[in-house]
Amino acid sequence: MRLRVSLIAALAPNMGIGEGDRLPWKMPRDMKFFRLTTRGHVVMMGRKTFETFGCKPLPHRFNIVLSRTRSYKGENLTSARSIEEAIDIGLHMTNRARLFVIGGGNVYRQAIEFADEMYLTYVEKAEAAATQDLFGDESFYADTFFPEFGDRDWLTCHVSRHYRALDSLRAPAEIRPTHYFRFWKLARRTVGCSLSESRHLMHRFGTTQLELPFWDRSYLSQRSNR
């Protein structure tokens, strides 16, 4: 069985994913999505990301830490010196179907060429969501970024509806959030979209009719100049 390599991340319109050693937002629903999606699979991360977890492996997953200088061994934990070595480790774990790359920025940049699919949570300010201005200048400050990519290589398999970003999954409906987010599932064109998984995501999160990929800024600028 071939190991599927997936990138999973939350990012802002400027492709920002982090500020220092923390996320620029707090989204319990997205964290729940992360836990459910990666549970039972292999997760790969850089050393700095691992340290933000207190150097403890994420439960219910096999953890691989990328590091050329440090070695990690433990229950559901090992280390690798390269992306290729990490993939090879995951490949020999017959009970694991996917390897999820979970950060940070440098690891995403190294891993994207090996990726078959991406699970991206797109975070936008409330003002942009209200006006449907997915490419507005309103963004979050970040010093760590997700790598750029384009629709020449990637297919949009699923886009969820907007969700309110609140501190609690049970927050009252009248609370006005400062930002919203959507779940996106993308697949490399050479791999294609899984119809069964797209139906599963649609059932869980709903869908939209938005067809314009949010990263295709060049298309948007050409459109505005017509």
Locate each region found by the language model.
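Enzymes that bind and transform nitrogen-containing heteroaromatic metabolites
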Residues: 2-226
